[in-house]
Each structure stands twice: as structure tokens, then as C-alpha cells.
Amino acid sequence: MRWLKPKASDAKKLAIDPPEPRAGRHGIAIAACVKNEARYIEEWVRFHQAVGIRHFYIYDNGSVDETRIILRSLLNEDALTIIPWAGRMRDAATSAMLNGQVITFAHAILNFGGDYRWMAFIDVDEFLLPKEAATVEQALDAVGDFPNVSLPWHMFATSGHETPPDGPLTLNYTMRGADPMTTKESVSNFKCIVDPCEVTEVSVHQFQTRAYGDLTANDAGKRFTRRARKSPEFYSNRFLQLNHYYTKSRQELMEKLARGWAYDSNATKYRDKVLSVVKSIEEDMVDDRSMIDFIERNHIDLGR
């Protein structure tokens, strides 16, 4: 009967049994999906190495540029795992597109999570910026033993660059949307850092854990429900800030629109969404130089 048909949204989350913690588990790993990121991935890796990331699990969606070569030149086997992960999948019963990122994140937790105290699930245009400490793990001391941390996007657009400027991405783009908790559609969202050995439900932007269900904490350790984290009261960037370099230059934005998104089959819908997000960001911006200050203070070599 039609009313029993699963909703398309069911393809966007997965229930799992948490992995068992392995002896000596420690540190933070990042799991990320990539495709043809050769232009900027060196900077992303160098920065996150500098802030204490122990291992990178890279799910490669069919890159044809030098992404893999660059990664292997920067990281040894103790710090890098590349998993080929090309293609799209649909639910056979409903024809709903399965979210490839959700599947990779669940795979990362189940196969590798037992080795780590924390796993972060971000994209390669997103940077985890400690605000007071030198490393991400030190910044997470503020949440204590709580297993589910949500970091709001701080959305950066073109910063007036028509073409790609010389030098590091993180030093060239400083203009971001003023309100990370805006209610404008698709401009506000979260990425998560979790204790993988407690996760029971996986999605791109939210997780559930065994002891706390859908409760999640901000970077200061203040706990909210999944729905309530969208309230202004949830906002904090005192200890850890997630910078999302959404467009880069205007030229790169146009290239992004021409490529489409690997996990969205509707090119027109994707283009309209991206342009709407950019417009919303650029309507109200602030100059945020906290990344530059951190890089200079800690003498981080970004390789560009």
C-alpha cells in the first residue's frame, strides 16, 4: 500500500551498532569524501595536520586529477587511508537516491572508529579552527566526555575575488556571513565531531549516540536536542570554529555550478540552491580574520 512506502528522507540516515573501542584508542581522525580536489587539498591536509589530526580517511569519488598523488606525497600509511568510492546508488524499492556521504561516514565509523577517541566528518572546503588552544583535541576539552558535538557553519563567499588569487585559501578569504545561525534556507547547518564508539545513527549533518540519543553539544559543552540546536542560544565559537569556504573565487563558483554535485542528480535545482546561498551570505557579511591570526600565531606552513 502507498502509505507504507518509505519516504525519500529515509535514504539520508543510517542506523548502526557502535564499534567496540580498541585498546589504546586515541586522537582524532577525519573522514571526508573528495573528487578532483588537487588545487586545495594540500593546504587542507597541512592545516589539519598542524591542529593535531591523527589520520585522514579519504573516500575518493573517482578523481582524475592529482588528488591521490598529492595526498600520498604529504601523508604516510600511518596517517592516510584512501578508499575508492565512486558512483551513485538508489534504493531498489523506492528509487530514492541514497546519500553517498552518509554511507561513507557509516563505513568509516564501523571499520575504523574503534581506534579513535573522536572522528570528524567534514568536507575539504571546511576547516576546523581552534580558537584558544593549539589543537582540535585540546579545544574539545570543553565538552568533556560528551560524545556528540555540532559545529555551525561559518560561511565564506568570494571575498571580492573574481579569479583565484595567489597564496593560501585560508589567508585570502576573510568575508563571511554575519550570522552563522541565520534562518535563511541552506545557509545555516552543522558538521559534527563524535565519539565513534557511541554512534547509533549516522547522517551528514547530525548523529545520534547510545546514551544521549539526539542530544548534541556546542563547542562549549552546552547540550541541546537536534532540533533545538538551531536556536540562537546554541551558538558558540569560543573554542572551535568551523570555517566553510563555500565558493572561493567567482570563477571557481561558476566552475562548481558547471560540474554539479556528485550526490545530486538535479543540476538545475543544485545551481539555484547554490546561487541562493551565495546571495544570502553576501547580503550581510563580517570580516573574520581569526584563521589568519591562528595560522600566524602558530607558524603553520600551508605549502603555497
Place the predicted regions along the sequence by residue.
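Short, acidic, metal-binding catalytic loop of nucleotide-sugar glycosyltransferases
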Residues: 46-55
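Active-site-proximal specificity loops/subdomain of glycosyltransferases
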Residues: 68-118
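Catalytic-site signature of metal-activated, phosphate-bearing donor transferases
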Residues: 1-12, 98, 130-304
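N-proximal low-complexity "stem/linker" segments adjacent to membrane-targeting elements
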Residues: 1-46
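Short beta-strand-to-loop acidic/aromatic patch adjacent to the donor-nucleotide binding site
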Residues: 116-129
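Short acidic/polar active-site loop segments enriched in Thr and Asp
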Residues: 54, 117, 147
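Short beta-strand/loop segment that forms part of the nucleotide-sugar
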Residues: 54-62, 83-86
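Ser/Thr-glycine-rich phosphate-binding loops at phosphate-binding pockets of nucleotides
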Residues: 32, 59-67
